[in-house]
Amino acid sequence: RQMCIRDSLYTSYLNKQSGKTNTISCKKKDVLGLPYESYIANRDVVLSGFKIAKEFLLRDQCVFRQRDLPYTTQLIPLAAICAVLGKSKCNEPNTIKTLSRWYWCGILGEMYGGANETRYAYDIEDMVEEVNGRPNAMHTINSAVFSSTRLLTLQTRLSAAYKGIMALLYKEKCRDFMNNTTIDIVNSMLESPDIHHIFPEAYCEKMGIKRERYNSIINKTPILPATNRSIGGNAPSEYLGAILKKVDGLTENELQARVESHFINYAELKADDFNGYFIDRAKSLLNLIEKAMNKPVTDRDAENTLD
């Protein structure tokens, strides 16, 4: 179904550009009414757009596995946009920058969760115009909003924004605490990183920390299975010490650098200072989100809103 919508979107865009129609539309009636001749004529170009989009996700956005893809629906306009622009244009730094901002605004603003056909039509026109330096409404970018309090309610990978924030950590080259692995396409396939608590759940329950806080994305990060086993249910001060003893030649300065590559305050983690660590990491994640969206987060004072 998504392939049919993508093909219809691309064809509708071309028809508007050539003056055959006045609007871009890829609703059910448009998909059903797509002429076979148009489908055949555009098939190879649309397929190439999908391949370009896949490369954009792998190379530029650090989305390596299907399970980590925030929205499958956003692939529809992305592939159609890439088909219109072509591979050479899509590989230009300015195009990557423009598409990246649109991509992250769509994910972090959680814009693709419902009926999206109208948004797809806006997206293909807006992004092609923006890449080519022409005025446009930038509907998705301008509509996207991320509130700091959303961090507390991001509890599972069912949310697109949850997956998106984890991909942003991959983009920043976060390193595994024990073996120093950075998560790239090769390592993600070979070693299967997953998302785990930084202050372990068992420890937080014992200390009376609210589940709303310890189970939020603020207290989670991607690590490898061996590291997660070393963490167990122990206090951070205990598992950091255990990792230092277990890994030959690992200095505390190096462990600190690895931990801080996840935007975690090492001193607060080592001191088992959940509250201080929690606020600092929330602020760091909000900085990361603002950087990706290139626009401010609402309710930015995390220390007040995330207590």
What are these regions (language model features)?
Residues E252-D307:
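C-terminal, well-folded lobe of enzymatic/effector domains
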Residues P193, E205-I231:
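Short beta-strand-alpha-helix junction that forms the catalytic/metal-binding core
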Residues Y10-S12, E55, T73-V84, S100-L108, ...:
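Short, hydrophobic/amphipathic alpha-helical patches that form generic packing surfaces
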Residues I107-H196, Y203:
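Intrinsically disordered, low-complexity N-proximal targeting/linker segments that flank membranes
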Residues R1-I5:
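Short, small-residue-biased leader/transition segments that mark boundaries at the very start
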Residues C62-T73, C90-N94, T156, R211-Y214:
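Structural motif
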Residues R213-Y214, I231-E260:
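Polybasic, low-complexity binding patches
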Residues D7-L85:
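Structured, charged N-terminal subsegments at the starts of enzyme catalytic cores
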